Swiss-Prot record:
Domain Ig-like: 20-117
Function: V region of the variable domain of immunoglobulin light chains that participates in the antigen recognition. Immunoglobulins, also known as antibodies, are membrane-bound or secreted glycoproteins produced by B lymphocytes. In the recognition phase of humoral immunity, the membrane-bound immunoglobulins serve as receptors which, upon binding of a specific antigen, trigger the clonal expansion and differentiation of B lymphocytes into immunoglobulins-secreting plasma cells.
GO cellular component labels: extracellular region; immunoglobulin complex; plasma membrane
Gene Ontology molecular function, alphabetical: antigen binding
Segments of this protein annotated with the region Framework-3: 74-109
Cysteines joined through disulfide linkages: C41-C109
Sequence segments annotated as region (Framework-2): 54-70
Keywords: Adaptive immunity, Cell membrane, Disulfide bond, Immunity, Immunoglobulin, Immunoglobulin domain, Membrane, Secreted, Signal
Position of the signal peptide: 1-19
Cellular location(s): Secreted; Cell membrane
Name the UniProt record assigns to this protein: Immunoglobulin lambda variable 7-43
Pfam families found in the cross-reference section: V-set (PF07686)
């Protein structure tokens, strides 16, 4: 069986109360099915902490965004076990372990700057 690369697109979706804030994600990543990949989300204001309540969303073509992770590492009941959220090196991180073909999508992070301390 041939392995088909998956393309994971990451877009910034993090408007906050401070118009000068910039949130950065990898523009795109490629991973083979069964592999593991970590997507990150950084803030120009400094290290991302749990006080930013990092959220992660997945959007597939023609569909509305679907929430995956909230408050850094909490999963919704519909979030597959292979998705996990964490803080890594001052960034919010989303890790996919055992990537499946259906994981090909755009992934967004959302940070709440009003709650950051």
């Amino acid at each position: 069986m041939a392995w088909t690369p998956l393309f994971l697109f990451l877009l910034t979706c993090c408007p906050g109360s401070n118009s000068q804030t910039v949130v950065t994600q990898e523009p795109s990543l490629t991973v083979s099915p069964g592999g593991t990949v970590t997507l990150t989300c950084a803030s120009s204001t400094g290290a991302v902490t749990s006080g930013y309540y990092p959220n992660w969303f997945q959007q597939k073509p023609g569909q509305a965004p679907r929430a995956l992770i909230y408050s850094t590492s909490n999963k919704h009941s519909w979030t597959p076990a292979r998705f996990s959220g964490s803080l890594l090196g001052g960034k919010a991180a989303l890790t996919l372990s055992g990537v499946q073909p259906e994981d090909e999508a755009e992934y967004y992070c959302l940070l709440y700057y009003g709650g950051a301390q």
